[in-house]
């Protein structure tokens, strides 16, 4: 047994770090070291068993006599699950190491230094304001990084987030008030997101952030705090505060009023800062090509960029599979790509979950189309039976005070069709605004005549084969919907004990999570003998027909053949003996209610017991005596309990952990009721679907879902497909009445008296044949029920092509290539499509299934209208004010009580509304978030960061077009001309790598890999390096070099925009249309231009990459030195000291690039062994090259020495304070261990800082 020793102190953040890591180990594939989950011990380990002096917490003992590991960093890394920190050597793994190191060496000391004074642990002479300043300095890099990232190293919490969050736990609890949290808004958002993850919450509970009011109890070790201040000191501090207040007031006044003589800001400058004011105003009829002949606007504006392109794409037919070929049947060596959209429900508008699905699917579709494949992405909408009927009923009640029964079936269905027309158009509008390259001429609705015919055909065929059958069984019944629902439409709410839940239709909450015991008197017993049973649903005792005990239970052997008396009914209940009873639970006796419990139903079948149903479809009691008759089920619960008490049969009530089944549509408590329904036999179809995955005919990605697939298929039950609704496909089955005395009348559960048909006439002919009578003796009554929505959705891959008719589309596009959807509907939809496709067409409906993660909000919460975190993607695209978000709630179907709760959620998450981000930024951001298998905690602020990326693309292209010049003519091909410079070769090499990573990422559905490769190329390589290096070349006298650079630059723009196009179709089209073409017959649009492939971009150049990597290493070192010495406005000379001639030659080759990138003066390579000039600061660029930056003449040595001496004195004082603090009486015994460790780290840092200061002092002394 492994043991994790931790501190019980609630603020012991090193121990908390270990405990959270252990939680992640439990939730994942186990601890990274491969051992068992450790036992937690809230005390130090015995000193006799540890190899280090106690107490050193946290500590992990890996089994008796095993390895000991201590200290938060080591223990957390050992407990953290393998694979969640990125593969070794990967970018993610490097980022994890970087931020863990930063948390331990920078954040922890700064956090402790700022927090300890607030806890009464300030040392002598310690300045709290300076400590807060140090914390702010440590938070700044974190704030900048988190501006564009949800987590520190990837799309889910890693060890880096764990280290940083626990380091900042004390400041967020005790120091950082609301105003400070606004300054570090990104850090605060990230901190809140992390601590709301289940693994963090399990350890930390609800983290309450510091409100600004503090009441802190003196902590142990308080004897080392500073003595009380003298009157003189207090007076001095009061003066300081007074000066500070005056200064702040002066600043506030200056901000509100311009200084004398100062001009007010010009309106046009204000407009320039506002990114949303630039619009496209040229008269362009819908469907005509946008005019891009004018000057590019100064900055990127989504409104300007996205105007006019989509109607033109649609009108030109770019999204149709026929584009560029005589017909869809024409052979294409590139192949066919077909995918159907998961048809969104017509229950309302699309949300960000739909936007994620759309972004992934459209990027894949555009990639396949640009690769030259015959590509079809088929649109459609789903009628969503239950969901739509519920929404429309709510709307009718809210607006007109009517329910559907008052309106009547036909009138109600007309209202639903109106709703569908309105919402369907809205959904298609949203999809178009998202840039979806769907073939709208093939759009369909699941209740269109073509698709309805497929549904009828499928039902009739399956019914004729006996796969669909009618049976009376227990079903999941929603009394609110007045309909049966399937198993996977039932949510399970776990209760630990007594809980009051809101139930639709009841004013007061209903009690659950209790076990009620009561007695049945044994019939004919002289001793007043009784049998005590217990139940969580006491109202169902009115439907009891027996009491069951175990055959081997000695307590009841004497009761064989006997009965008990029901206290409220004129019937006796036999005592039956059945193996299903657990003798150890309760009294070992169980009440049997076959009509309202699945286990009881099976017992009843074995013992031939009557099933007495005591509830109608609305949950009111029937078949019971007064006073219970007609009572709603949960009112009856109270009445039965009172009656039992009155008769002296009540025996007790106690808390009982249980699971309450809830309808996921109505939130009603589901009742098991006996009802005749239509079922699909799933056994054989499930075996076939499971075998298809086993054989590899069907791939499910991520592969982790395959195990779940097999488990579900192996344990599948028959599927109830009838719903007691009005909206949906009416079941094409008819109850038969035969007007012939020789044929007895039938009953509903008897399947022989039901017939299916494509038409009523066909059904009548079949019925006549079945009963051997003429058709005129047959009367038919069509079933009032409709089919489960998932039945028609399961036919979608071939119903859209008109199956069973053999159309051209069906022969070309079925089976499809890919099914892409969220993992939450793997069994709702994907499994049904596979089973029905194999059964009806003898083909798999698609070859691959890719399941993306589920979108949650920035705090990890499920999207819910009542939480106010359901976001319309158009609000992210266009932006919306907080009031606008509130107004949407008022126009929704939310109950008034939920509206205020939702408003609070919106105020907390979007205090300033949602900024305009644009479609491209939203799409790119969603794909960048998509990590296989993990849910996505979406922070809208991060999407804004990708809008800034769009602006970078815009400015880079604008600069590049100026550099190319008006008369520029690109080469017919992108082949290098042979005269490329080193940096030309380098950027081509990096571009080739981006092309490789993009194609491999698309093939593997690794969207973050693709977005990272493209983002890095454009931002860090093209903009930050190549364009900067290009400026002196384009302005120079070497025309050959300039021409060669222009061709390379054009290639970068051409290939780079094509790479980005699947993710960012609007901005890339806008920029691509402004580029000159290589050939006159080039494609009209970027969306049908060939996607770059490695064979086209075979420019990998390791030699150039090594050279530029050295240049960039030198540049980073020079920039760091310039920052250290505040040389922001000067260009200091730089001397490179190399270890060998090869490095020297390489450094010489890149010296001009270093000069440009580092803003240096002369960049010279020193001869081997030659000394550097006097007065240089030194830094290391690599193990083969050091930098000497000339400071002589650029800085005042005497002044710098003065500053360094002051800095040295302060560092010495700080070191002395820490040493005195650690030597103080009671320090090791009373000060928390984590504080001791923080002090030790801070002392090491201070001593290292002193050594650096001494080196700098020595340097400047030589310059005097």
From Swiss-Prot:
Domain GST C-terminal: 89-219
Polar residues: bias regions: 218-230
Residue numbers binding ATP: 865
Keywords: Acetylation, Aminoacyl-tRNA synthetase, ATP-binding, Ligase, Nucleotide-binding, Phosphoprotein, Protein biosynthesis
Pfam family, one: Anticodon_1
Modified residues (Phosphoserine): 437, 527
Catalytic activity: tRNA(Val) + L-valine + ATP = L-valyl-tRNA(Val) + AMP + diphosphate
Residue span of motif 'HIGH' region: 344-354
Protein origin, superkingdom: Eukaryota
GO terms (BP aspect): valyl-tRNA aminoacylation
Modified-residue entries (N6-acetyllysine), positions: 645
Transmembrane segments: none
Compositional bias of kind Basic and acidic residues: 234-248, 260-275
GO molecular function: aminoacyl-tRNA deacylase activity; ATP binding; valine-tRNA ligase activity
UniProt key word tRNA-binding: no
Motif ('KMSKS' region): 862-866
Entry EC no(s): 6.1.1.9
GO CC annotation: cytosol; endoplasmic reticulum
Known regulation of activity: Can be regulated by protein kinase C-dependent phosphorylation.
Modified residues (N-acetylserine): 2
Subunit structure: Forms high-molecular-mass aggregates with elongation factor 1.
NCBIfam families noted in UniProt: PRK05729.1, valS
Similarity remark: Belongs to the class-I aminoacyl-tRNA synthetase family.
Record-given protein name: Valine--tRNA ligase
Species the sequence originates in: Rattus norvegicus
Gene: Vars1
